[in-house]
Amino acid sequence: TVAYYKPIRLKKWVLPKNITFKPGEIYSIATQNETQSNLGRLGIFRTVAVEVTPLDSLIRKDSLDVMIQATFDVPLEATIEANVSSKSNSYIGPGLIFGINHNNVFGGGEKLSVKLNGSYEWQTGGGSQHGKASLFNSYEVGLNSSLTYPRIVPGFLPQLPRTRKYPAYTRFQLGANLMNRPHYFRMVSFNGSMSYDYRTSLRAGHSVTPFKLVYTKLLNTTESFDKTMEENPAIALSFRDQFIPSSSYTYTYDTSYGREVDNRFIWQFMGMSAGNILSGITS
């Protein structure tokens, strides 16, 4: 039985999927902890409390009554970060990051995050060319968004064995960035990715990125920058217009996950294919 105050923005399958108590089964602390962990991982409840009491009945004196009380958290969160940077090339200026999160955007614990960042720097006389302050200022503006599902969303990853003991997430990410460097260049970049993070045991974690795309393009350059690139072909390669698809897999084995140990051992393996490798396969 589910009792709630209307309106409630929660899909019908969310609670049954994350509550591991079943009528007629033997009660265990592990089941209670698993239920609390599942509900807490959704990120939509401020508090989750489980109360277990014996039934006041002579007929079913061997049974327990389980009551779960959950309080919804505020779905929207906003953050603002401000900073000031001073660099060795005499550039100084402020930076600002504004972020907003919706912790239950589709009613199933999905988290939508949007972050806007910007910075502006100007050059003081101490490090400027010919002892004069630069007439051109350095700035950077970026917009990044991500959508996180607290479960595996069917797609590029094969169907995993059904398990609710460990967390699993699917993330979609999109971003764009504009960078201006005085006396050198103005460059724009775009990126997008899809990734899966899940655990198959208490110690083994997996991160699969079947698709990631990065695109960079120089909008304009100065004569000084072009001359430097001609003199340094190796550096010039990193500034060419690039369209880079990639895929990656990371396996992490952590002996301390879920418990306290004196000696912690972490082993991580990562494999990635990008650029020319993918081009060779398609050709």
Which residues make up each language-model segment?
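Short glycine/serine/proline-enriched coil/turn segments at secondary-structure junctions
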Residues: 57-60, 87-91, 106-108, 182-184, ...
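Secondary-structure transition/capping motifs at alpha-helix termini
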Residues: 41-46, 70-76, 102-111, 154, ...
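Transmembrane beta-barrel architecture of outer membranes
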Residues: 16, 34, 63-65, 77-79, ...
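Transmembrane beta-strand segments of outer-membrane beta-barrel domains in Gram-negative
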Residues: 1, 7-10, 127-283
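Composition- and surface-driven signal marking solvent-exposed, interaction-prone regions
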Residues: 31-33, 50-53, 67-68, 80-83, ...
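Transmembrane beta-strand segments that form the barrel wall of outer-membrane beta-barrel proteins
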Residues: 19, 52, 76-88, 96-98, ...
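Periplasmic polypeptide-binding modules associated with outer-membrane biogenesis and secretion
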Residues: 1-86, 99, 117, 122, ...
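Secondary-structure boundary/capping residues
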Residues: 24, 48, 109-110, 156, ...
